[in-house]
């Protein structure tokens, strides 16, 4: 995905989406998908269906029919006999304070424990760094409060994007501040399953943004681990020019 190119599609054709997911699940369950040229050389140990994610180059919680979409996909999961197939929603957390959004997300729980994941972005510990990452004047405290509100009702995975800005990473002080935000969420009764620390892996729209090298990303993640009581996992980036 090239972040320098504007999104092509802005509308969701609900019935088309449901039909396409139904057809894809049938291909996967039957094994027919591995006979197609694109997937024929997939190693046997990788031939599995992990999850269905509500994500993409947009914000799922802005979709008015998100709750219906979650229900429809949950029904398809049951139809195809895939009880272990996870449903995942990725969100920037801006709308998690809205009751209609929370009601939609609560539909994830119907499959029982382990049947879903909700990934919420928390990319900063301080307001100045957050504004630089967001590219606009948003309240970091609002994001933290929204995640805490949601995490009291649903298990949440925190996604923390750690890039460089003009060649400099956020530094250890920012990571300690981020730990404070995470502890604020758990201290308010929020259930955080995991923190995913990652860096850029594709070309960003902002030329000032770059990738943190693997060893340095490990150092920053270790600083976070020292100050939180939830698991922290690291996902390395790649140089998109190569």
Predicted regions and their residues:
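C-terminal accessory extensions appended to soluble enzyme cores
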Residues: 176, 215-242
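Conserved Radical SAM active-site core
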Residues: 1-114
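A generic structural signal for well-ordered alpha-helical segments enriched in polar/charged residues
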Residues: 23-30, 75, 149, 180, ...
């Amino acid at each position: 995905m090239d972040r320098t190119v504007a999104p092509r599609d802005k509308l969701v054709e609900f019935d088309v989406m449901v039909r396409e997911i139904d057809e894809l699940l049938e291909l996967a369950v039957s094994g027919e998908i591995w006979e197609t040229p694109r997937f024929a050389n997939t190693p046997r140990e990788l031939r599995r269906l992990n999850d269905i994610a509500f994500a993409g180059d947009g914000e799922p919680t802005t979709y008015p029919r998100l709750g219906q979409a979650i229900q429809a996909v949950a029904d398809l999961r049951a139809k195809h006999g895939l009880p272990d197939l996870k449903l995942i929603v990725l969100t920037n957390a801006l709308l998690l304070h809205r009751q209609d959004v929370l009601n939609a997300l609560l539909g994830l729980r119907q499959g029982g424990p382990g049947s879903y994941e909700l990934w919420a972005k928390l990319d900063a510990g301080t307001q100045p760094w957050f504004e630089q990452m967001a590219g606009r004047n948003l309240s970091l405290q609002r994001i933290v409060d929204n995640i805490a509100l949601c995490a009291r009702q649903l298990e949440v995975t925190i996604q923390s994007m750690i890039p460089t800005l003009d060649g400099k990473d956020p530094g250890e002080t920012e990571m300690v501040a981020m730990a404070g935000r995470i502890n604020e969420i758990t201290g308010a009764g929020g259930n955080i399953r995991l923190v995913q620390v990652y860096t850029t892996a594709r070309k960003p729209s902002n030329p000032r943004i770059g990738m943190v090298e693997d060893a340095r990303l490990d150092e920053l993640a270790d600083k976070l681990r020292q100050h939180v009581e939830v698991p922290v996992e690291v996902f390395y980036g790649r140089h998109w020019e190569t």
